[in-house]
Amino acid sequence: MMSTGFSWGTQALSESTEVNSGLGDLPTSIPRYTPNLKPVNNNHHSNGKKRRYSEDQESKVVKPTGNRKHYTTPSTYYKSKKSRTPKIMGQKLPINRLVEALDHTSLQRLLESLIHEHPEISNTIDKISPKPTLTDSIELIKQKFNSIMHHLPYKCDTESDYSYLRIKTHLNEFLNCLSDFILNFLPPIETNVFNSLKFLDEVTDLIHTLPNFSNSEFQYTKSMAYEQISNTWLIVLNHKMRPDDGTNNNNTSNTNEALSSSSSPSPVAQCNMENSAQLIKIIDELNLQQKLAKHDNMSIGKFKLVVEFVNSEIENYENFNHTVTNNGGILNDLITVDYSNFSIAARTSH
């Protein structure tokens, strides 16, 4: 039973096993006399040598000597393999990709938070930000207005106090936004009179369309809104820039001065007359005379001064054109000369 547990026995080992198999399970300490098994003992002696040789070979394979420098341990192999493979780790998005992924609302909140944390960048944003166009400005204010209408209760009187309380927050947001954009469309920030008047006409219509809540607070707020918008109409219509110093000048007084003067008008008066002609053209293009009359009727007389100013401008301009036409006819009569006396026949007759 010397080779129990091993699997690399030789043929001689098998023969020895067959011979010894008939001995039975006798104790190994009892000596026995077996004169006829000498060949078997020789085989057993040679088998022991083979087994020792196999164990020596196994020890050489499993336990290499320290002189073999080319042998690489598994840990060293893994380290060299790890150094050749780049380590891949997760990382955050670049700023440009992060901004691209944000929607309008998220980007707006991000900018507001950034300005809140760093107020010093407000001037920089104001300088590099593009100016909102007339169309975009009106569209934004209409969105604020639609927010009011969408939050009105369905099963309740539209003009009740309950309805007003439901939309009060959205109404304040609408009026605040309206106030900011009105100031942005006033001179000298906005130099295009057409854009200013077009904007004022659009927002005045929105004020008319607001539900007429019976709440006294709303009635006061609406009345104040009409008065402020009416004043901005007058500011834009009466804004005439002088070419010399850029200060405001009353166009009506200069028109009357030009009409009453028998001599040619001064350069300032002439410039104001040109501005007045441009204003009359814009009033005609926007049909403001009729629209302002409607605004005055809808606001119960809040635009009376604006209507009177526009009518006065139109009347003065028509009077000026009529005066220039008449003066031109008189001047033509004064310089008319009878050239018949200077004919060759008349000169020879003398």
From Swiss-Prot:
One GO molecular-function entry: proteasome binding
Record's keyword terms, sorted: Cytoplasm, Nucleus, Protein transport, Transport
GO biological process, one term: proteasome localization
Comp. bias (Low complexity): 247-266
Keyword field contains Cytoplasm: yes
GO cellular component: cytoplasm; nuclear membrane
Subcellular location: Cytoplasm; Nucleus
Region (Disordered): 17-84, 244-269
Superkingdom field: Eukaryota
Keyword Nucleus annotated: yes
Family the UniProt entry places it in: Belongs to the cut8/STS1 family.
Assembly notes: Binds the proteasome.
Annotated function: Involved in ubiquitin-mediated protein degradation. Regulatory factor in the ubiquitin/proteasome pathway that controls the turnover of proteasome substrates. Targets proteasomes to the nucleus and facilitates the degradation of nuclear proteins.
Protein's UniProt name: Tethering factor for nuclear proteasome STS1
Source organism: Debaryomyces hansenii (strain ATCC 36239 / CBS 767 / BCRC 21394 / JCM 1990 / NBRC 0083 / IGC 2968) (Yeast)
Gene from which the chain derives: STS1
